Amino acid sequence: EEAWQVIMRDNPMPAIHGRACYHPCEPVCNRQSVDGAVSIHAVERFLGDRANELGWMPKSDALPSGRKVLIIGAGPAGLSAAYHLRQFGHEVEIREAGAEAGGMMRYGIPAYRLPRNILDAEVQRLEKMGVKITLNHKVEDAVKEKQQGGFDAVFVCVGAHISKRTDIPARDASKVLDAVSFLRGMESGEQPVIGRRVAIYGGGNTAMDAARTAKRLGATDAMIIYRRDREHMPAHDFEAVEAEEEGVKINWLSTIKEMDTDATTITIERMELDENGRPQPTGVFDTLQADSLILALGQDIDSNLLQGASGVELKPDGSVSVDAGFMTGHEGIFAG
């Protein structure tokens, strides 16, 4: 238990972290020069599971501060912030637009990677600590909610959950889905009808998750289409390896040019990398047959709830500009 208490000083969800993190620290661990890297990934998972099993609670000597903080979004950032704020004695309320807490941990990471009972246990610990979580509450105006609720500060952490679009002809065909909605539908029980042949466009971890989930739904063919090669894909290599082991086919150096109106025939163009590693068209085309197409091209941020906050500046990618303490240009409004 003492080891778990040490981990909890910085990492409030070790049972989740011990499953979802790809542990990049282990390959560069300086312990390698002695015998081998510390298996911190496995340690976190073991201690986190043990804590959930035995009902351990983190220690805190903080007295009530009299400060009240609103957190907008119950994803990993919001839940982590709530934990640390409670450890300082602040009163904390999380307001979440969805029906359950977890954010992309629940709606973006498939259950085979992160069992929901593990996620639920970590959330329940926060509630036992005194964090209030209000679900099905979409905040439209952060400043107004701050004023009406009498909060001393607001932390906005809604995440990037709006799928990016693309200009592929027939993009809005009924058989074309975005990966976030697809994975969210799996979690909410509204499983989409995808057919036996499924194409996934993108090369990130979300694309791998969508392809592996499609296989679990019974797809005989799950085909990833990605414009670069394996070396340049944004997904972690082990994700691609596990996907291929489960029967997912990855079409490297390929991009979608068009599809028919029923999204059953997809025309792809073969690409090649130039001297700078950028994909260039070759003029060589091929076709794939698919019953549905899942787009996994990244996500954008919905920052509309900050439109009424004077002084808040947005970056070109839609994220919010903050100082070293994560405060925006509006006093008392933080973002991360």
Which residues does each PLM region occupy?
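Ferredoxin-type iron-sulfur electron-transfer modules in oxidoreductases and energy-metabolism complexes
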Residues: 1-19, 34-63, 186
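Residue-level detector of alpha-helix initiation sites
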Residues: 12, 75-76, 100, 204-206
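Feature captures the FAD/FMN-dependent oxidoreductase FAD-binding
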Residues: 63-72, 120-168, 257-267, 292, ...
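Phosphate-coordination loops involved in phosphoryl transfer and adenosine-cofactor binding
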Residues: 65-68, 136, 194-198, 219, ...
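N-terminal Rossmann-like FAD-binding beta1-loop-alpha1 element of flavoenzymes
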Residues: 67-93, 206-215
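Conserved hydrophobic helix-helix packing surfaces used for dimerization/oligomerization
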Residues: 69-71, 92, 198, 222, ...
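Rossmann-like dinucleotide-binding cores of NAD(P)H-dependent redox enzymes
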Residues: 91-129, 133, 211-258
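FAD-site-proximal beta/loop scaffold in flavoenzymes
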Residues: 174-196, 274-336
